[in-house]
């Protein structure tokens, strides 16, 4: 019997978590919350509009921990971090809500969204329509669909539910096979390329560059993982990739928003009164 991978463990735990949540809050109750929720902020449009200007469209991540790195940020105040990111020039936010493996929380998403006016993606392992409706009820503007965690039928179903409740979809791929499946199954405008190898956990920006020619020009490509310095940013920009999802580089900085500005907008003066998060 083979040993389960980290992803398999996460997905098994996620199924248990969803069952427990359903027992507390029904799908019908979530749908009622969605009916009373604020209008979505337009996650995809915010990125697309920035990319059209050939300006960095940064999805700044709010992440406390990960299975591979452990705790990344001890002093973790999602609202302050969100304000710091907005002051630093972020286009959107990504908030981890997985509890068991990333020490995330639904409350972190709500705190971050309430603290700024940026669109927010719920970063979690989405495997059930219940989670999609739940994401909208929490105030998310977009969900993440990870191709390696889903079959094509699941992907299509989750995307349809997202569309029905007004959420954008960012589909995440790691290799050519996953990209082919995503393009065949989904019409989302947002294609995220995760530069982290799921088997070795090594990170290479070449993953984005290798897949780029295979992605239709009408899709917006988001490069994920491995952006740590100006050279990384410039490498992407000279290849016409202007959207970035960055977490760890910001989370390890004393002032996440200032680090965002240093990496992506070095020509700007520091934001006046931008909150220090230390």
From Swiss-Prot:
Molecular functions (GO terms): indole-3-glycerol-phosphate synthase activity; phosphoribosylanthranilate isomerase activity
Keyword Isomerase in record: no
- Quote the InterPro entries the UniProt record gives: Aldolase_TIM, Indole-3-glycerol_P_synth, Indole-3-glycerol_P_synth_dom, Indole-3-GlycerolPSynthase_CS, RibuloseP-bd_barrel
Does this entry carry the keyword Amino-acid biosynthesis?
A: yes
UniProt-listed SUPFAM superfamilies = Ribulose-phoshate binding barrel
Q: Please list the reactions this protein catalyses.
A: 1-(2-carboxyphenylamino)-1-deoxy-D-ribulose 5-phosphate + H(+) = (1S,2R)-1-C-(indol-3-yl)glycerol 3-phosphate + CO2 + H2O
Q: State the Pfam families in the record.
A: IGPS (PF00218)
The protein's UniProt keywords, in alphabetical order, are: Amino-acid biosynthesis, Aromatic amino acid biosynthesis, Decarboxylase, Lyase, Tryptophan biosynthesis
Name the species this protein comes from.
Pseudomonas syringae pv. tomato (strain ATCC BAA-871 / DC3000)
Name of the coding gene? trpC
Please report the name of this protein according to its UniProt entry: Indole-3-glycerol phosphate synthase
Q: Under which EC number(s) is this enzyme classified?
A: 4.1.1.48
């Amino acid at each position: 019997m083979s040993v389960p991978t980290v992803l398999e463990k996460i997905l098994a735990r996620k199924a248990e978590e969803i069952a427990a949540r359903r027992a507390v809050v029904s799908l019908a109750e979530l749908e009622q919350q969605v009916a009373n929720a604020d209008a979505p902020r337009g996650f995809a449009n915010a990125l697309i509009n920035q990319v059209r200007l050939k300006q960095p469209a940064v999805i700044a991540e709010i992440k406390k921990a990960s299975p591979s790195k452990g705790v990344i940020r001890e002093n973790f105040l999602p609202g302050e971090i969100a304000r710091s990111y907005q002051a630093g020039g972020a286009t959107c936010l990504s908030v981890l809500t997985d509890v068991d493996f990333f020490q995330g929380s639904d409350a972190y998403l709500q705190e971050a969204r309430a603290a700024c006016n940026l669109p927010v993606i719920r970063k979690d392992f989405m495997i059930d329509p219940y989670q999609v409706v739940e994401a909208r009820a929490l105030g998310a503007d977009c969900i993440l669909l990870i191709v390696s965690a889903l079959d094509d039928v699941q992907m299509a179903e989750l995307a349809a539910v997202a569309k029905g409740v007004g959420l954008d979809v960012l589909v995440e791929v790691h290799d050519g096979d996953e990209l082919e499946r995503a393009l065949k199954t989904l019409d989302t405008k947002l294609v995220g390329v995760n530069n982290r190898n799921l088997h070795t956990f090594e990170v290479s920006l070449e993953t984005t560059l290798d897949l780029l020619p295979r992605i239709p020009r009408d899709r917006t490509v988001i490069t994920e993982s491995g952006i740590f310095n100006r050279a990384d940013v410039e490498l992407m920009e000279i290849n016409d990739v202007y959207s970035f999802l960055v977490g760890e580089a910001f989370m390890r900085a004393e002032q996440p928003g200032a680090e965002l500005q240093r990496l992506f907008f070095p020509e700007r003066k520091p934001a006046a009164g931008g909150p220090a998060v230390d």
